[in-house]
């Protein structure tokens, strides 16, 4: 079992920092390359760049009343949820399907039945 993880390309867990501007303030986010690739994929599905999506995600999270004391951890969980929702069949693996076109309420209801 461990060989599957140990022998993966080490570039996947190499960390990289990207800077983005949120409300006029420059902030840096440091994530492993595998998470950045996932964020790029999520953003592209809705016709956005990663900085555009992260800014939007930040604002919508604040508007929803979330405490984003650790935005980087929040992003990692978002990436993992995205992949799990694909595996569970709630998000199509077809990258041409925009996430914004999906029925979020239905997906969240299905997810809550699985991960309660």
Regions found by a protein language model. Give the residues of each.
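Short Lys/Arg-rich basic patches
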Residues: 4-30
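Amphipathic, hydrophobic secondary-structure cores in small proteins
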Residues: 22, 28-74, 79
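Short, positively charged interaction helices/loops
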Residues: 64-110
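Charged interaction scaffolds used for protein-protein
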Residues: 112-116
């Amino acid at each position: 079992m461990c060989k599957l993880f140990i022998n993966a390309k080490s570039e996947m867990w190499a960390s990289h920092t990207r800077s983005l501007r949120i409300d006029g303030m420059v902030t840096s986010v440091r994530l492993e390359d595998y998470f950045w690739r996932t964020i790029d994929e999520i953003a592209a599905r809705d016709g956005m760049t990663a900085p555009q999506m992260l800014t939007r995600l930040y604002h919508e999270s604040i508007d929803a009343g979330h405490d984003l004391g650790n935005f980087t951890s929040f992003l990692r969980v978002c990436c993992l949820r995205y992949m799990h929702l694909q595996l569970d069949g709630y998000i199509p693996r077809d990258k041409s399907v925009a996430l914004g076109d999906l029925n979020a309420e239905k997906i969240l209801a299905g997810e809550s039945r699985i991960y309660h």
